[in-house]
Structures are given as C-alpha cells and as structure tokens.
C-alpha cells in the first residue's frame, strides 16, 4: 500500500544521506 511506498522512499533517502543511522 501507500505506507510501503513511503517506507521505501524514506529508506532510499536515508541511504542517499550515507546509510541509515544504525549506530547513531
């Protein structure tokens, strides 16, 4: 659904910023 699409976009954005802040 729309939530999945938004989630993918957010993940892609985080990756573009240098990866998700897992160790932050």
Curated annotation (Swiss-Prot):
Antimicrobial peptide. Expressed by the skin glands. The keyword Secreted applies. This is Caerulein precursor fragment BM1. It is found in: Secreted. GO terms for biological process: defense response. Belongs to the gastrin/cholecystokinin family.
């Amino acid at each position: 659904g729309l939530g999945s699409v938004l989630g993918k976009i957010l993940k892609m954005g985080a990756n573009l910023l240098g990866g998700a802040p897992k160790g932050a």
